């Protein structure tokens, strides 16, 4: 291909220009611009080129609203017959739909060549010695052109006195061009006198031109001069403004015409010229060859993204040889983005007062960024970011210009680097290897530059802090950027002050600086970490001073990162992160935080060994449980451990003795006081025997480790103790869920005096020495869940008399008085124990209920049926206390109910004899449980409860007392069956414990006798005012015991299966339409079960 191309270039002046080989690129093959002579040459070589039958003369095409697409055909008869006349244009296109340019399409198929007329040659005999200009091939605007053939501008005619210029291939505004083959400007005509050769035509010109090119777009070649004049200039491949180019093919400027006499060769054309340009190049963009080389890209306000070839034109053999540019910035604000595969050959020229931002995203480093020079004029601004930027030639900056370096960018030249007056260099350094880093370098020297010209901006540095970096000039050809730590000129220091969220990795060895001059009061061997950012030590440093962590994070990036340090001091609020790597600290004074590894880092299978002594100050914290999924990590302190009230945090999956847990191993002696906080990471809890080991020491003081806060799993409370349950291994510390009977009694007896504060409780629990006959400690939250379950099922469970009070019947006339609306208030107090014999619960409740009859009917002349509705609000607050651990938990229930009731009396008038009562209601509640030191839990519950009651009212005797008070005595045996169906769904606590209620659908039976006395004074005989005191004795039996299952371990209320209830009260009518009633009841059961309740009710008759 390249040999054929070379043949055509020599024989026919190839439109891409350039003797010699074109670059071979992927999807970037050179396309040839054919003149009619080229077509003939192709036929001679056997090329299968065929064209459709042409039209004749200049053609005009108009796109109407209904005509959106047209196939163009060739046009003939465009070249003039007369000497020196201009060639005719091929197509004029107009459109009625400028807003639909993308829909107004011209198609040129692969068998079509659209060529304008060629200019006529001059003829002295005809009186016209000048050659004519070539015509334009397509002229129009607001179009889409899809080319799979050839579009050629007309060539200029040759002349003795003057020659013709080549025509343009496509000209117009608002053109969207998709080119798959060839678009070429016409060639200039040759000159045979002292007149210059004709100029080549441009391939594409216009404004607002989006172009997608997969073929070849090239300017026409300039005409040769065979006399004493200059060669003609090559045309541009594309020129205009607001150009948007996507190139996977080739753009080429036309070659300048050769001067074979005493003149100069013509200028090579530019590949792309214009203002407001956007270029995405994955092909080749080539300047034209000539006496003055053409630019590959020339313009202003450009954005160029390159992963292909951008190459300036090359010299011809003429007497004038002026280098062109690969990229020529003529003004405005410009960007050059370099991707992998980018090749720029030729100079990059930035005119005065222009701006160029270069982003180098090519990290292969295989070739220089520019094969040429970088020349920036006066008052220019050049910004570099990304990878280093290399230039094979010279670099120059004019007066008052600026060079900005960002990230890890640098500028390196193989030639000279020169700076004019008042040039400013600004470097913004985010992160680098901290070894001496070349910001600027030039193999042949840097001139016009000093350190005063540079401004270093360190975006990681805390505002106002002393910079840990410094820049200096080395050997007159390098600007070096490095750490102040290594400075030998008196400004050295060892402080790294990083702002919040900043992270700096030091990848060079920090050794003692023996040549420091103490200007900054630095000892030359100590490291100080300040500021809220993170400093990472990635090498095995050898400095011998102290490591002071005043703020932020000091993180290890390798093992033994500070092995020779005299000691490490972690101040309050600061963090030392070992990153899971073994370290030597000699001494570690921790008033801040020490992390075994990064938060949420993967599990560490090997222990982290820290050599040196640990002092854990009051504000200090050592964290082994850096992630909830990393339980089982081990921290080894290869030295002594002294606690001054700091905290050690571990994780554990708590169960039996074989539970998986983080561990602290101390090779030396443990002394002082260290508080231990253990987080259960999903363990179900279980009964332990000897305990779960979490800490081991070579030797240990008593109470060197004290439990902080509660340690819970499932239904169990764990505690920290020294040694095993059997009293062995007192140099080790264990978690246990059990306590022996003797000391549980001691705990219970001393609870009121020795457990007055939580700290005293923790110390006592931690110091217990267990023996045989131990018991396992239960969490008090179990009692709160049970108390809530009891309340939600029982607080809305009235009997007939609780709901209606007494039925008032006149003792003389037997007349019945009743109401249709009632309100009652209930207050109660409950105390019960749980089956574990550790937990005791007390609860207080209030209920506000309202109801009334909505229907009254009868089946016979004597009976009566009443139907009513009722609703209520209730609230309970409970507290459960463990007498052994002194931990408590509080529960609350708050909810509503709504339902129906129905009562039937055998004798509606007398209200004696048999009666039946039933009710059914739906209840819903919000519940909470909050244990000491634990996150509060919230859950809901709902369900249906109902009851059926029957009784017989028997009047035994009536009499009038000596004070004229009429009395009637009634006996009322009664029975009630209640089904409690309110329940909560299974609930998972914040600590992972699964909570399930038990004892649901409980059936409660009540059997009892009620005795009442209705009395009316003689002074009230004309009124309805009367009173009824009563006394009830009931036996209550429950089919189930309310309980809870926590991670498979169950506990339940005791004492409520068989309960005796005593109830007494009085009811009466205060006025004809107002009655009140009230009673007090006391329930007693086994195991200290008791429930006290009072009711006050009001009835109103309408």
From Swiss-Prot:
Changing residue 53 to I: In plasmid pINV_F6_M1382. InterPro entries: AC_1, Autotransporte_beta, Autotransporte_beta_dom_sf, Autotransporter_pectin_lyase_C, Autotrns_rpt, Bact_Autotransporter_VF, OM_autotransptr_brl_dom, Pectin_lyase_fold/virulence. Changing residue 45 to R: Disrupts targeting to outer membrane. Residues 741-755 have a biased composition (Polar residues). An immunogenic protein essential for bacterial spreading, it elicits polar deposition of filamentous actin (actin-based motility). Inside the host (human) cell mediates nucleation and polymerization of actin molecules on the bacterial surface, which provides the propulsive force for intracellular movement and intercellular dissemination of the bacterium. During invasion of mammalian cells, triggers autophagy by binding to host ATG5. Interaction with IcsB leads to escape from the host autophagy defense system. Binds ATP and displays weak ATPase activity. It holds the Pfam family VID. One of its GO terms (biological process) is symbiont-mediated cell-to-cell migration in host. The signal peptide, cleaved at the inner membrane, guides the autotransporter protein to the periplasmic space. Insertion of the C-terminal translocator domain (beta domain) in the outer membrane forms a hydrophilic pore for the translocation of the passenger domain (alpha domain) to the bacterial cell surface, where IcsA is cleaved by IcsP (SopA) and released into the extracellular medium. This cleavage is important for the maintenance of the sharply polarized distribution of IcsA but is not a prerequisite for intracellular spreading. GO terms for cellular component: cell outer membrane; cell surface; cell tip; extracellular region; periplasmic space. The keyword Transmembrane applies. Disulfide bonds: none annotated. Residues 103-507 are annotated as: Assembly of F-actin and vinculin binding. Residues 741-763 are annotated as: Disordered. Residues 817-818, 855-862, 921-924, 951-954, 978-981, 1012-1026, 1069-1071 are periplasmic. Cleaved between Arg-758 and Arg-759 by IcsP. Changing residue 758 to D: Loss of phosphorylation. Protein expressed but not cleaved, bacteria spread better in host cells. Abolishes cleavage by IcsP. The keyword Plastid does not apply. N-terminal repeat repeats lie at residues 140-171, 172-205, 206-239, 240-273, 274-307. Residues 1-52 form the signal peptide. This is Outer membrane autotransporter IcsA. The chain crosses the membrane at residues 808-816, 819-827, 846-854, 863-871, 912-920, 925-933, 942-950, 955-963, 969-977, 982-990, 1003-1011, 1027-1035, 1060-1068, 1072-1080, 1094-1102. Residues 140-307 are annotated as: Gly-repeat region (GRR). Induction: Transcriptionally regulated by VirF. Different strains accumulate different amounts of the intact autotransporter protein. Secretion across inner membrane is dependent on the SecA and SecYEG apparatus. Intracellular polar localization precedes secretion and is independent of SecA.
């Amino acid at each position: 291909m390249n040999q054929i191309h070379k043949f055509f270039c020599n024989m026919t002046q190839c439109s891409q220009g350039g003797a010699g080989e074109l670059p071979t690129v992927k999807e970037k093959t050179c396309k040839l611009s054919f003149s009619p002579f080229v077509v003939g040459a192709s036929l001679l070589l056997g090329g299968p080129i065929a064209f459709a039958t042409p039209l004749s003369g200049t053609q005009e095409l108009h796109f109407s609203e209904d005509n959106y697409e047209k196939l163009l055909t060739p046009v003939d008869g465009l070249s003039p017959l007369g000497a020196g006349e201009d060639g005719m244009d091929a197509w004029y296109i107009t459109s009625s739909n400028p807003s639909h340019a993308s829909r107004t399409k011209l198609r040129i198929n692969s068998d079509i060549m659209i060529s304008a007329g060629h200019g006529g040659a001059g003829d002295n005999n005809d009186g016209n010695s000048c050659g004519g200009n070539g015509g334009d091939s397509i002229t129009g605007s607001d179009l889409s052109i899809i080319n799979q053939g050839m579009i050629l501008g007309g060539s200029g005619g040759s002349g003795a006195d003057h020659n013709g210029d080549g025509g343009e291939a496509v000209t117009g505004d608002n053109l969207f061009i998709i080119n798959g083959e060839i678009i070429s400007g016409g060639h200039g005509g040759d000159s045979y006198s002292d007149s210059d050769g004709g100029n080549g035509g441009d391939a594409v010109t216009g404004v607002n031109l989006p172009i997608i090119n997969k073929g070849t777009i090239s300017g026409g070649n300039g005409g040769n001069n065979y006399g004493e004049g200059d060669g003609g200039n090559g045309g541009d491949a594309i020129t205009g403004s607001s150009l948007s180019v996507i190139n996977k093919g080739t753009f080429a400027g036309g070659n300048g015409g050769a001067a074979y006499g005493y003149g100069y060769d013509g200028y090579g054309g530019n590949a792309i010229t214009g203002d407001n340009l956007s270029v995405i190049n994955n092909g080749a963009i080539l300047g034209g060859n000539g006496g003055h080389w053409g630019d590959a890209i020339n313009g202003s306000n450009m954005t160029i993204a390159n992963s292909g070839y951008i190459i300036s034109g090359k010299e011809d053999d003429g007497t004038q040889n002026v280098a062109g540019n690969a990229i020529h910035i003529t003004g405005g604000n410009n960007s050059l983005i370099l991707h992998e595969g980018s090749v720029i050959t030729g100079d990059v020229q930035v005119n005065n007062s222009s701006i160029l931002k270069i982003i180098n995203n090519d990290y292969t480093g295989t070739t220089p960024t520019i094969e040429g020079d970088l020349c920036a004029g006066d008052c220019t601004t050049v910004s570099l970011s990304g990878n280093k930027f290399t230039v094979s030639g010279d670099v120059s900056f004019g007066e008052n210009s600026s060079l900005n370096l960002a990230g890890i960018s640098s500028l390196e030249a193989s030639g000279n680097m020169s700076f004019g007056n008042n040039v400013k260099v600004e470097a913004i350094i985010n992160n680098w290897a901290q070894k001496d880093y070349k910001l600027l370098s030039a193999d042949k020297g840097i001139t016009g530059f000093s350190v005063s010209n540079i401004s270093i901006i360190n975006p990681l540095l805390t505002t106002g802090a002393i910079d840990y970096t410094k820049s200096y000039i080395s050997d007159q050809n390098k600007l070096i950027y490095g750490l102040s730590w290594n400075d030998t000129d008196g400004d050295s220091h060892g402080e790294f002050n990083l702002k919040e969220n900043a992270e700096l990795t030091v990848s060079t060895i920090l050794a003692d600086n023996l040549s420091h001059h103490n200007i900054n009061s630095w000892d030359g061997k100590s490291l100080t970490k300040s500021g809220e950012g993170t400093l990472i030590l990635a090498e095995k440093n050898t400095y011998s001073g102290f490591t002071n962590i005043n703020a932020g994070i000091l993180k290890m990036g390798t093992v033994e990162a500070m092995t020779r340090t005299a000691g490490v001091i972690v101040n309050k609020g600061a963090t030392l992160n070992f990153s899971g790597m073994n370290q030597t600290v000699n001494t570690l004074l921790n008033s801040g935080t020490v992390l075994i590894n990064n938060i949420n880092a993967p599990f560490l299978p090997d222990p982290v060994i820290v050599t040196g002594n640990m002092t854990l100050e009051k504000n200090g914290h050592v964290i082994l449980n850096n992630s909830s999924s990393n339980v089982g990590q081990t921290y080894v302190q290869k030295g002594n451990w002294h606690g001054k009230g700091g905290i050690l945090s571990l994780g554990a999956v708590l169960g039996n003795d074989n539970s998986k847990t983080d561990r602290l191993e101390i090779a030396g002696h443990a002394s002082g006081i260290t508080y231990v906080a253990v987080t259960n990471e999903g363990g179900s809890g279980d009964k332990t025997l000897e305990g779960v080991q979490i800490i081991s020491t070579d030797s240990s003081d008593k109470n060197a480790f004290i439990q902080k806060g509660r340690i819970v799993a499932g239904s169990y409370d764990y505690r920290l103790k020294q040694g095993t349950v059997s009293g062995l291994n007192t140099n080790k510390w264990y978690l246990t869920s059990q306590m022996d009977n003797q000391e549980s009694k001691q705990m219970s007896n001393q609870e009121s005096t020795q457990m007055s504060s939580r700290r005293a409780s923790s110390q006592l629990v931690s110091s217990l020495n267990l023996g045989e006959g131990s018991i396992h400690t239960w969490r008090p939250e179990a009692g709160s869940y049970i108390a809530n379950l009891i309340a939600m099922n029982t607080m809305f469970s009235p009997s007939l008399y609780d709901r209606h009070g007494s039925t008032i019947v006149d003792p003389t006339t037997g007349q019945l008085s009743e109401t249709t609306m009632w309100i009652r208030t209930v207050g109660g107090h409950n105390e019960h124990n749980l089956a574990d014999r550790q937990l005791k619960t007390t609860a207080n409740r209030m209920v506000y209920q309202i109801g009334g009859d909505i229907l009254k009917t009868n089946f016979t002349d004597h009976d009566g049926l009443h139907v009513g509705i009722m609703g209520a609000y209730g609230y309970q607050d409970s507290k459960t206390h463990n007498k052994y651990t002194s931990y408590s938990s509080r529960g609350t229930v708050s909810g509503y109910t709504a339902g129906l009731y129905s009562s039937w009396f055998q004798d509606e008038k007398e209200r004696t004899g048999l009666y039946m009562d039933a009710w059914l209601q739906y209840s819903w509640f919000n519940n909470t449980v909050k244990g000491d030191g634990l996150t509060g839990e919230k859950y809901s519950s709902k369900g249906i409860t109902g009851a059926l009651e029957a009784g017989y009212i028997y009047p035994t005797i009536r009499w009038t007392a000596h004070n004229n008070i009429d009395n009637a005595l009634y006996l009322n045996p009664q029975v009630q069956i209640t089904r409690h169906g309110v329940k909560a769904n299974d609930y998972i606590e914040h600590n992972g414990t699964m909570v399930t209620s038990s004892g649901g659908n409980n059936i409660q039976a009540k059997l009892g006798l009620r005795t009442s006395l209705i009395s009316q004074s003689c002074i009230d005989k004309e009124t309805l005012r009367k009173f009824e005191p009563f006394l009830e004795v009931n036996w209550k039996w429950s089919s189930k015991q309310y309980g809870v299952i926590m991670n498979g371990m169950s506990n339940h209320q005791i004492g409520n299966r068989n309960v005796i209830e005593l109830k007494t009260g009085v009811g009466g009518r205060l006025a004809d339409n107002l009655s009140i009633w009230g009673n007090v009841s006391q329930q007693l059961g086994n195991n200290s079960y008791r429930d006290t309740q009072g009711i006050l009710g009001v009835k109103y008759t309408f």
